């Protein structure tokens, strides 16, 4: 979201103006996570910590002229992948807004408690497939080369539960 407000709107406006065939996915995590969680025009807090008027990404996208807009919750992998496939089948300028709060921001700044830690421990080929497909930083590879095991490091698990949608 912060990058969209910083430098993405002009590219989107040009895509609409030039009638490009493009699918843009905007990752709306509610903060400027890459540089320390500073506010941006899409959040309700100013740099001084005061409430402010925030810009709604969907309204901005539609205001630029995009009519084909969808919102997804990316931790719902099936729904997100379905929406992506549907949007890929269309033409013109399309935008998907993926809305989930930054886990670090939610836990540190908003003081949200982490949900339950996922309990995943797969063995063999399924373990390697799970590790390769998701590459979660909380996954730990153990076992042997012949019998690999993947488990979850509780201290690193954000509680998103995406692994439960990917692993058997």
Regions found by a protein language model. Name each.
Residues 126-151, 156-158, 162-168:
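Iron-sulfur cluster-binding cysteine motifs and their immediate structural context
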Residues 110-116:
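Phosphate/pyrophosphate-recognition segments in soluble nucleotide-handling domains
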Residues 2-97, 103-110:
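Thiamine diphosphate
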């Amino acid at each position: 979201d912060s990058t969209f407000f910083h430098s993405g709107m002009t590219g989107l406006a040009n895509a609409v103006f030039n009638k490009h065939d493009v699918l843009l996915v905007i990752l709306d995590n509610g903060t400027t996570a890459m540089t320390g969680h500073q506010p941006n025009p899409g959040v309700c807090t100013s740099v001084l910590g005061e409430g402010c008027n925030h810009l709604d990404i969907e309204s901005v996208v539609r205001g630029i002229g995009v009519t084909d807009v969808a919102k997804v919750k990316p931790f719902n992998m099936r729904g997100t992948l379905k929406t992506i496939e549907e949007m890929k089948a269309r033409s013109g300028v399309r935008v998907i807004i993926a809305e989930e709060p930054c886990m670090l921001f939610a836990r540190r700044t908003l003081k949200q408690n982490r949900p339950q830690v996922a309990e995943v421990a797969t063995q063999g080929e399924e373990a390697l497939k799970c590790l390769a497909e998701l590459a979660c930083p909380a996954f730990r590879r153990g076992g042997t080369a012949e019998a690999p095991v993947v488990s979850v490091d509780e201290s690193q698990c954000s509680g998103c539960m995406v692994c439960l949608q990917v692993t058997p």
